[in-house]
Amino acid sequence: EYKEGQDNVVLLTLENGKLSGYSTAVGLIESDRVAREAWVTVERERSQRVTLKPGRIKRLIALVSGGDFGGGGAALKELRVTGNRFGLEVFFVRHGFLGLANNWIDAVTEEDTRGMSSHASSPIGSSRFEDFKDEQVQRAAMRSLAPYLEDSALVVLGGDGSLRGARAIHETYGVQVVGIPGTIDNNIAGTTSLGFHSAIALANQSIESLKATSAAMGSIFFVEVMGAGSGHLALACAYQARAEGILVNEHPDPDTYIEDIVLGTLQRTLGVPNKSHIFVVAERTPHRHHREGGVHGLVDYVAQTIATWPQRRGTTGPYSLASATKATILGHTLRGAPPTPEDKMIAQHLAYETVRRLVEQPDTIVGCMVAYHDSNRIETIPLHAVSPKPFDWELFTRMHVAELQHDRV
């Protein structure tokens, strides 16, 4: 017997080439029921805020917010190209939400977007604008948007903080907004973010160069990359480079990792001819050697520790090869990485679908983020449901299994 608050599950069986089935009720536990009801309520509110009707949008406004990233130019150009094909006027806002509050909104022509697809970073500028959390600043932005609100949509390209800003003006003021994920940190669940592949490609060039000099000189390199408190970028860089180890914020005990994996690996391999020693570190990963974490204090500690070790394997004679320990911080170089073909392709897919759905099915995309999956599959995730991406512990473990088996070359 079906009761309110239960799911209805249909079970199918195949007998003599025919499908048969029956329905059964499965009760929800209280926490699941509450979560589902909350989701339904919030989604109903989102759909009620959608004022655009199919075929009624006339103007499109786009901005890039937060930390810059590769691929943004390709997305912006596709928004202009596809928008014009659908008969829309397209406007860009310079320097993100800061520009919106200052009314730095410009109409865009074909000439303005020439060469934009290959532009590193954001060709229309970006900014971190913490003041946008203030209600008065949001009202200033709304005054800038006032002439466009009736028949326009705002597209926000950026990371989790920028998407929170987009959600705020959608829920508070009813702005018809769509988010496109863009961050080298790739820390948004359910999508690949613009800039991630470009950052990895540039990091790979640097790390491969460091591997070559490490193997030649017997040096040890700790390479720090950005991550905004997450290790997705560091893990991808370390895995593709076959680094000896990786320090990330998600690890429950970085100090033990330093002792067991970093120093343990060096004890086994330091002095092996033509062996590189590369460790990738996510910025601000906490450890006991420096209050700022990351590579700070770590390099000195490792250098001081290995200085106490006896002559290492692979060395003969009265003189040993010195193993210099170095820190290399890639930092903001990865934000300005030239966009890779993959990032440009993802950007164009996301931008095209954004415009198409705004024109044809606005109720499915307003108040949402467009998400990219493999095989060019585009989905939408409501802005209220955007969440942090879980760390890939399976890849982390696979990387270290190979290390323990001494498979690295």
Residue ranges and their predicted role:
Residues 1-55, 297-299, 303-409:
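C-terminal non-catalytic interaction/assembly regions of soluble proteins
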Residues 15-17, 65-68, 93-98, 128-129, ...:
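Short, ordered loop/turn segments at secondary-structure junctions
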Residues 31-54, 100-156, 161-162, 184, ...:
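Glycine-rich oxoanion-binding loops at beta->alpha junctions
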Residues 51-101:
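N-terminal phosphate-binding or glycine-rich loops at protein starts, especially the Walker A/P-loop
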Residues 59-71, 122-127, 152-157, 220-224, ...:
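Short glycine-rich or small-residue beta-strand-to-loop segments that form or flank ligand, phosphate
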Residues 69-79, 100-101, 133-139, 154-167, ...:
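Short glycine/serine/threonine-rich phosphate/pyrophosphate-binding segments
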Residues 77-86, 107-112, 168-178, 194-198, ...:
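A glycine- and small-aliphatic-rich helix-loop capping segment at beta-alpha/alpha-beta transitions
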Residues 90-93, 153-158, 164-168, 173, ...:
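Accessory alpha-helical/coil subdomains and C-terminal extensions
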